[in-house]
Amino acid sequence: MATKKYELTKEYFFHGEFWHQLDDNKGRFSARIEYSPYHGLILDYCISDSESPRTCEILYGVLNTGERCTLIGKFDFTQGNIHFGKGIIHTGRHGFPIMLFNDFYAPDSKIEYCDLSLHGLQEFIHPHGFFTQLKHLEHPIFIAKGNHWTLQLVNHVSFSVIGDDLLNIINCQNKAALENIIHQLKKTKELYPDAFFSIRKELVFYFRIKSSNDLGIKDHISKCWDISGLFSILLNKPTLPEEINIKFKGNGSKTPCLLTTGFEQRTIDLALREIKHQLLPINRKHINLGKIFCKWFKIAERYMPLTITYQYETGFRTLHQAHTDIILFATQLEAINKTIGGSKNEKYMKPINEYASLFLIQEIEMFFKKFNNKSIGENIATLRNELAHVDRKK
């Protein structure tokens, strides 16, 4: 059965009934769930039953779409509005971080794998409009292994039924060649009368994340953010999760997931802006993704401030943001220098010489030559110190 698609950059609204015991729905109450990428998940509730929970870690529910769902968070319904009369009624709006579809899941439910698709990933892999050049692969395109983690780049293909109408969509200027193909197809159909043809409709790439020590939902989602954070740097723009689908052990189908993210509208617009494979600063042809992810999983936490800067980019800069970014980037250069064994005197230039392209180095040199003839390293150090200390002359 096909998994229903829930995209994290779109808006959704649901009505449903909810309760807090996995095997007992007494004390259930009515609520509306609102989801948007900028406000996240919000439960708009009305509780009148004395057996309904006042606080809980998890809620189970059925939606007006006919789906089961599991809401994960810390729910405290005593913090909303309380109405007194013939009974006590609790109402309010309560945010929560995670919503799972299709079934009821206990907090300790075991995960087989988690599938992540990212905005821009398809274009990063191959130019849009030329996907017929690619073959569907049953095996992973690459496998990267980290500490207790395995990451695979896999593809999924969907087909549309065409049957005997396959002959109607084939054409060739060489009439003899066309007649030969039609003849061979008819002959094949005679040999295999039960054969039923379909044509590829869509080929989609996504990451598959597996844990070797049964880590939970929040750990898998954290790893999703590590992956999208790296792609934000590679693509030089916010790269947001498009879909997250979790495969629980013992469950026949994957479970869609919505998350509270809290992105600004300008960040979402920038993330959804169309990109071109040929114009990207880096695409799949330029790098070894498997090797990069093996290293990234070891250092992702250290560079979280940098990835967050890229992921929450809006395309606009205030003076405060510009100053903050300069200090942050200088600090990251120092961290990279330490990683590659550079000395204190080369803390800015060694990382640049090691990893920057000649074009980038020339652009930085041209910028600083407007002000002086000092080296790039000296100018970065001066600029960083001017901004980091209030009393320094700017």
Residue ranges of predicted features:
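Long, contiguous, compositionally biased segments that the model treats as domain-scale units
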Residues: 1-228
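Amphipathic, oligomerization/interface secondary-structure segments
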Residues: 2-5, 248-251, 258-394
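Glycine-centered secondary-structure boundary/capping sites
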Residues: 66-68, 73-74, 148, 236, ...
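Helix N-terminus capping/helix-initiation residues
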Residues: 117-119, 124, 215-216, 236, ...
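Basic/polar, acidic-poor N-terminal "presequence/leader" segments
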Residues: 196-270
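Generic hydrophobic, helix-prone segments enriched in Leu/Val/Ile
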Residues: 31, 151, 231-232, 296-297, ...
